[in-house]
Amino acid sequence: SIVGTWESINLNPTVIIYRSDKEYLLSIIYVSETTKQASPSTYEIQKDGSQYFIAPAPKRIYIDYDPAKDVLNLSSLGDYLRN
């Protein structure tokens, strides 16, 4: 299961994936450099054929998961390891 907290290996924002009713949600936790305040942006995980994605503007971010390595990949943010 990809549910959980994921840390970027490229120092991108932390990602949390969780289930709400019948859908899965992905929150990207942005932390302000100046105020150190965390502000999440939450998106519903959608499916297109066999691909999963979230759709923040301006383009989709595709989600790939390697269960053997337990590595999550977000198309524009790189690899994430389970925290």
Language model features with spans:
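Mid-chain, structured segments of secreted extracytoplasmic proteins
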Residues: P40-A68
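Short beta-strand segments that buttress and anchor functional surface loops
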Residues: W6-S8, S27-Y30, S50-A57, L74
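Short acidic/polar mixed-charge low-complexity motifs
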Residues: L11-T14, K59-I61, G78
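Edge beta-strand at a domain terminus
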Residues: N73-N83
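N-terminal glycine/threonine-rich, aromatic-flanked beta-hairpin/loop signature
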Residues: L11-G49
